[in-house]
Structures are given as structure tokens and as C-alpha cells.
Amino acid sequence: MINNKVNVSLSKDLRKKYGIRRFPVAKGDIVKIISGSRKGEGGKVVDVDHKTMKVSIEGVTISKADGKQVPFFIDHSNISITKLDLSRNDRYERLREIAARKNLPPPEVPEETSNDTKESDENVTGADKEETNEIKEEDLNDNEDKNNDGSQEA
């Protein structure tokens, strides 16, 4: 039988923050290798093999005899999570439950903002915003005049 959870130890900062030592690893978490031949390397989790309890990390590869680069899977006991990906609601809720049980403050709500809105807000300066507001007001006044003209004829 395969256990669905591959628990990985948390970094010291996250242990203090969340009040737990281990948490299931998932795609998107940032991890660091703490022992083995690749000690010190780290990156974003790309894949979790639940059968062998090993984790593939972005940028950690091994070259085959023919020169191809393939993912290097690391045992879950040799890594620690340095940043949790809380974009999935079930993981965030689990941390909230743990915090409530241990009388700790709830974790911060994960930021779910799209890059499109950030870029559009950054490209518009204060002067541009004022100009667009003036244009909108003029359009509203023109529309009101048209509505008033049309109502007098009818």
C-alpha cells in the first residue's frame, strides 16, 4: 500500500512559524538538500514519487552515459522545506488547524494576484490616471447630453 503523504522536515524558521517539525511535500515547495552528495543544493520541487518516497528538484539533474540530463531523485529524509507553497487551499487549511490547536497565530493568507494586473498598474503613472479620469468624466457628460436630447424629442 502506498502512503499518499511524503513528510519532509521543515527549516528552523518554518518550525518556529508554524509550530510543527514535518509537513507533506508537494510540487511548488522550495526545498534544500541537507545531506548526501548534493548537500547544499536546492530549488523548487518538480515531482514527488510516493512509491519510493523520493523528490525531484528543479535544477538537480544527473547526466546519463549518452549525455542526457535526467532528474535526480532525492530521498525525503535528506531534504528540508524552506518555503511552503500555500496556493492550494487544503494545505493552507491544514496549517490553520494546526495553529489553532497549538494556540499560534494563523498563517498569512497566500497572495493570489495575477501578473497581468500588476504590470498594468505599474505602467500607468499618476498623470496618466488623472487623464483617464478626465476622459471618463467627459464621456459621461456627453452621454448625459445625448440622453437629455433624445428624451426631449420623444
Curated annotation (Swiss-Prot):
Residues 97-154 are annotated as: Disordered. The gene is rpl24. Residues 115-135 have a biased composition (Basic and acidic residues). This is Large ribosomal subunit protein uL24. It comes from Picrophilus torridus (strain ATCC 700027 / DSM 9790 / JCM 10055 / NBRC 100828 / KAW 2/3). NCBIfam families: rplX_A_E. The lineage of its organism: Archaea, Methanobacteriati, Thermoplasmatota, Thermoplasmata, Thermoplasmatales. It comes from the Archaea. GO terms for biological process: translation. GO terms for molecular function: rRNA binding; structural constituent of ribosome.
